[in-house]
């Protein structure tokens, strides 16, 4: 069980880093420049939430759920982190100086969660062997 707990360290660290980045006061950001033209902020949100979902799915898969339950857990995680992103927009609006609510950030968070879900599903669920999924029989283990 101790080994399984170690798999939760990277996603917990990423959660702490992400929360810190999402709660930086708006005065700490540079003023408008060429980065606004390429929507760098949205790409950062996509990447941040893609990594969030991927890391949490990677940790959850170590808990040895069968394929169906694992897929449901992955979907739950994607929805959870999308809700977290939406909640952080409200935190930014009401509690962080010089930050505001941006529907574009919520959309970027959702896209990142979907990309993380698809990648995690393809990487972790599709590669499960019959023994790992708990449906091992004599015929498929030979």
PLM segments and residue spans:
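Bulky hydrophobic segments
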Residues: 1-104, 110-132, 136-142
């Amino acid at each position: 069980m101790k080994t399984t707990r170690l798999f939760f360290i990277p996603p917990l660290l990423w959660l702490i880093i992400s929360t810190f980045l999402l709660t930086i006061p708006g005065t700490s950001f540079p003023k408008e420049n060429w980065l606004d033209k390429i929507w760098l902020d949205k790409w950062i949100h996509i990447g941040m939430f893609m990594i969030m979902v991927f890391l949490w799915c990677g940790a959850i898969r170590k808990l040895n759920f069968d394929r169906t339950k694992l897929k449901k857990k992955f979907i739950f995680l994607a929805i959870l982190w999308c809700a977290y992103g939406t909640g952080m927009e409200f935190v930014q609006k009401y509690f962080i100086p010089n930050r505001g609510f941006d529907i574009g950030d919520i959309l970027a968070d959702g896209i990142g969660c979907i990309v993380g879900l698809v990648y995690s599903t393809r990487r972790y669920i599709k590669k499960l062997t019959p023994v790992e999924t708990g449906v091992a029989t004599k015929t498929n283990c030979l």
